[in-house]
Amino acid sequence: MQICVTGVVLRSRPLGKNHTLTTLFTPEGLFTFFAKQGQTLQCDYRETLVPISLGKYTLHRNGSRLPKLTHGDILNAFEAIKQTYALLEASGKMIQALLASQWKEKPSHKLFSLFLNFLHRIPESSNPEFFAAIFVLKLLQYEGILDLTPACSLCKASLPYACYRYQGHKLCKKHQHKQAISIEKEEEQILQAIIHAKQFSELLAIAEFPIAIAEKIFYLFDSLQEEKKSERNSSEDPYHEILRLSKVVHPY
């Protein structure tokens, strides 16, 4: 049976000496397929397998076996992202967040649209790491696991701004988790501004703020993924795959 899938390549893992397993993020969720000779020049569609590429893929599906690539077309290679390591690294963090949080063929139309828009807009940001962190915060919001109320998640004491955060929880000093991080008043205001932003122009403007909060956002996300960390393989780092497959040279 022939099927057509449109999506963004999140990773392409080597399979044997020559083949690849490629994972897409699509409006219908994560989708993985087999590409014969995908690591070699014999594959006519090799460029469509490079991470951070939007493509349209024709696949042959045979029962429970992995779908096999029969044709691929590049719709957007996002070349601007692949020209600088800072943009590659930031985009890689968005990719890692999707791989860690999304499920196989779990419909995610709004999240796919959001991710695609972030890929289009991230080259416009002078602070791509913070812009990627904004996407991760939006991902937590999309999943409905981020406490946005002005109160402690446990005792409901009023916490208009300064607080502690751990995983999706917002906590007062009395109920802070031992691994919670302190969120200062200005930082919480920035988090709330990100959550309530409706336009990308607002998000780009927020990313210009001289405030070091990106690492805290990544920590909040990672604290939700602790049980999955042992399953991750550091050799599958998406932006290192890009460097390998597209021959981008590290500028430093």
UniProtKB/Swiss-Prot annotation:
Is Oxidoreductase one of the keywords?
A: no
Read off the InterPro entries from this record.
ARFGAP/RecO, DNA_rep/recomb_RecO_N, NA-bd_OB-fold, RecO, RecO_C
Q: Print the keywords alphabetically.
A: DNA damage, DNA recombination, DNA repair
Which BP terms in the Gene Ontology apply to this protein?
DNA recombination; double-strand break repair
Task: Tell me its family.
Answer: Belongs to the RecO family.
Cross-referenced HAMAP family: RecO
Q: Tell me what this protein is called.
A: DNA repair protein RecO
